[in-house]
Design a protein with these regions (language model features):
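Helix N-cap/beta->alpha junction signal
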Residues: 49-52, 103
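Glycine-/acidic-rich phosphate or pyrophosphate-binding loops and their flanking alpha/beta elements
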Residues: 24-43
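Catalytic donor nucleotide-activated moiety binding site of glycosyltransferases and closely related
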Residues: 14-23
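Phosphate-binding glycine-rich loops and their immediate beta-loop-alpha structural context
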Residues: 56
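Short, small-residue-biased leader/transition segments that mark boundaries at the very start
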Residues: 2-4
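TOPRIM fold recognition
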Residues: 43, 59-154
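Short beta-strand scaffold segments in enzyme catalytic cores
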Residues: 8-14
Length: 154
């Protein structure tokens, strides 16, 4: 008897026509692993470690219309700190890069490497250290500020 299981994952396209795949038990990619860059003609860029951090950021920006500049950033998602160097060409176009990487050793190391790759004229702002120093990533931060303990709905 053959056992057929349904398989599913949420997929996010990357810059090499591959897909970053996620579900509750799996984190991987189909085809080639790469960064994902979304250019919108803005002067500044937001840098994320993964797509769920980007989605959390989008929700945060939606919840904070009093900070309109949150919606005026181009996007770079590393999809893995191991390939952070691939972001050099894209990030070098910007005068300011807002980094929302994880507050852990790989995130800090990726930030250090990226800082060394960028032109001296590019300002790299460590937003994770400023905005959510007690959380590992943007998703954890968003969950924390929206928890019922803080008087908000989840």
């Amino acid at each position: 008897q053959m056992c057929i299981r349904d398989r599913y994952a949420l997929g996010f396209a990357n810059d090499r026509s591959g897909f970053e795949l996620r579900n509750s038990m799996f984190k991987g990619c189909a085809n080639a692993k790469d960064i994902t860059c979304i250019a919108g003609g803005n002067k500044s860029c937001a840098l994320f470690e993964g797509f769920f951090d980007l989605l959390s950021f989008r929700q945060y920006a939606k919840d904070h219309p009093e900070i309109p500049e949150l919606g005026k950033l181009d996007i770079c998602v590393l999809n893995s700190t191991a390939i952070a160097d691939r972001s050099k060409d894209f990030l070098s176009r910007y005068g300011k890069v807002h980094a929302f990487l994880d507050n852990d050793p790989p995130g800090r190391e990726a930030l250090r490497r990226i800082q060394g790759l960028l032109p001296k004229t590019t300002v790299l702002v460590n937003e994770s250290e400023r905005l959510y120093p007690s959380c590992n990533d943007f998703n954890e931060f968003l969950q924390k500020i929206k928890s019922p303990v803080n008087g908000r709905e989840m």
